């Protein structure tokens, strides 16, 4: 449609075009809301001298953001009042299970913490592998550390975490704005960290032109407008995540 489309990629944050624009080197789309899973936690709880001392006495380890999902579940249990009566909050972690696709995101977060991607050494997906079994087991174990009224979508998860009843939450970055909203009870007390395993699931989305489009040039013109400044900065102010470098330089 546009042989100069490559020129549109220079405005984006480093790394975004590779994940949101190209497939096997070919440009198929432009990024509109790039995002990534981030671990958010109650900084006031993790830095509490009482919580830190109690955790150390119980597990002989420092209380800090978890590096593995085994640690994540242990900390979640520590902050779940039904399991630890002295916990200052009712639940250790949120969980988002609204549909097969949403629940799959929780599963993949745990799988990617122990293997690079979905595929085994033979290039096939093996859901009965030991790694997949471990990821599923870690997800099932977390159910006892969260509210029985699980969240259906990440906006709901962010609102629930903002109520102040959870110690940790895994959210996509473009859904986290409610943590600092006027109604949030955790403003100033939210820390953030890389996901356990340092291999988070990417989220967000890109826009491309369908091959069935009757007016592809007009469609591409609209997409370029949607995926560039000043619109991306305006979207960021409304809680979205911008793909453009200029947003973060302002």
Could you describe each region identified by the protein language model?
Residues 73-80, 101, 106, 110-153, ...:
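Glycine-centered hinge/linker elements that transmit conformational signals in sensory
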Residues 167-172:
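Paired acidic/hydrophobic, glycine-rich loop segments that form the ligand-binding mouth/hinge
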Residues 2-12, 62-64, 97-98, 114-134, ...:
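Short, solvent-exposed loop/beta-turn-alpha elements that line the ligand-binding surface or hinge
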Residues 45-56, 144, 212-219:
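Short helix-loop capping/hinge motifs at secondary-structure junctions, enriched
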Residues 67-71, 149-163:
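Short helix-initiation/N-cap motifs at beta->coil->alpha
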Residues 175-185, 197-250:
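C-terminal lobe and pocket-closing loops
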Residues 9-29, 70-88, 176-183:
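Pocket-flanking alpha-helical
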Residues 1-38, 47, 187-193:
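Hinge/lid segment of periplasmic solute-binding proteins
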């Amino acid at each position: 449609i546009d042989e100069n489309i490559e020129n549109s990629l220079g405005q984006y944050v480093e790394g975004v075009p590779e994940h949101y624009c190209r497939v096997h080197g070919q440009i198929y789309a432009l990024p509109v809301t790039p995002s990534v899973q981030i671990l958010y936690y109650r900084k006031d709880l993790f830095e509490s001298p009482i919580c830190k001392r109690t955790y150390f006495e119980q597990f002989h380890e420092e209380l800090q953001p978890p590096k593995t999902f085994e640690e994540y579940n242990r900390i979640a249990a520590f902050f779940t009042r039904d399991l630890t009566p002295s916990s200052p909050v009712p639940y250790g972690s949120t969980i988002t299970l609204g549909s097969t696709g949403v629940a799959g995101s929780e599963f993949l977060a745990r799988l990617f913490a122990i293997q690079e991607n979905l595929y085994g050494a033979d290039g096939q997906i093996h859901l009965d592998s030991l790694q997949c079994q471990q990821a599923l087991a870690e997800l099932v174990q977390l159910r006892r550390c969260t509210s029985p009224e699980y969240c259906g979508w990440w906006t709901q998860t962010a609102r629930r975490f903002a109520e102040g009843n959870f110690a940790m939450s895994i959210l996509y970055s473009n859904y986290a704005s409610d943590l600092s909203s006027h109604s949030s009870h955790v403003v100033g007390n939210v820390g953030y960290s890389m996901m356990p395993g340092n291999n988070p699931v990417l989220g967000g989305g890109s826009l491309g032109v369908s091959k069935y489009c009757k007016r592809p040039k007009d469609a591409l013109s609209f997409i370029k407008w949607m995926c560039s400044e000043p619109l991306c900065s305006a979207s960021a102010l409304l809680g979205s995540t911008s793909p453009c470098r200029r947003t973060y330089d302002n």
